Amino acid sequence: MSYPEKHIALVCNPTRENEKALGIANNIEVLLSGIDIPHKIFTSAWPESFDSFTEAWIIGGDGTMNWFINQYSEIQLPLALFAGGAGNDFHWMLCGNETTEQQVDHVLQSSPQLVDAGICNEKLFLNGVGIGFDGAIVHDLLGKKKLAGKASYLLSILKHIIGYHEKPCLLELPGETIKEDCFMISVANGKRYGGGFHVAPNAIINDGLLDVNIIGKISPIKRMKYMPVIEKGEHLDLDFIKYRQTEKITIHSPGKLHAHIDGEYFHTVRFEIDILPKRFSFLY
């Protein structure tokens, strides 16, 4: 099959810990060269724009993808994401467990599909925002070498699951206000984060909705008991969880809360989160 109209930018995670992503990028480059598709690879330096390309293929994890959409927030080109990070949760939403070779073949034959993005305090995300306990987990992992999949996440959970204290929160949704001491709040566009925790099993990336899970006060014993249930995405009917679907949510707390956005740590006292329907175009 011929692809004369294509000119693909291969964009690789520009960090010191990008050996996996570089290896995948080199593999993709070989595959594209073998079928004579014009392309250019970007590693340590990314261009100001991709206007001279027909597609941008990003090789990295959720953090790399998040950095890309915030750096190129108005990009109209079709995008593809290849799993070159530790968790790769958004990639899983798009492509499941495809190999690189399978995905290249699949992407080359795909038509662009529009997917939603979220925005939290003026920063875009694709996967979700985690506030409270899982934000504390991401904070604990700062500066540490990440293990593949959810191994790093699990180890940090075991370290903190007993001693973490719920934080007072005020949550405002259209037509509803919730005041509660919260162990954890997830506001998701995708189904999972943390390298495989299915925090929002009903989430769909093009339905124009955010999936919100609010976990209130929960004893240490219950935390240990139900964390595997949350990992599997079987938690929505538990009595200590409030589940909502919404287009927007605002969350306040008297003190700064640990949080992450697509796995990238931040902390604040106020979160303003909205869905941006059909914001980006992806090949999958």
Predicted segments with their positions:
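Gly/Ser/Thr-rich active-site loops/lids in small-molecule metabolic enzymes
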Residues: 145-152, 201-222
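Short glycine-/acidic-enriched loop or helix-start segments at secondary-structure transitions
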Residues: 21, 67-70, 90-92, 196-197, ...
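ATP/NTP phosphate-donor binding region
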Residues: 1-59, 66, 70, 74, ...
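Glycine-rich phosphate/pyrophosphate-binding beta-alpha loops
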Residues: 130, 186-199, 265
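Catalytic core of DAGKc-family lipid kinases
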Residues: 5, 9-12, 74-78, 82-183
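A generic structural signal for short beta-strands and their flanking turns/coil linkers
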Residues: 165-167, 181-183, 206-211, 245-247
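Short acidic/glycine-rich loop or secondary-structure boundary segments that cap or lie
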Residues: 134-137, 179-181, 192-196, 220-223
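ATP/nucleoside-binding phosphotransfer catalytic cores, i.e., glycine-rich phosphate-binding loops
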Residues: 173, 179, 204, 214-284
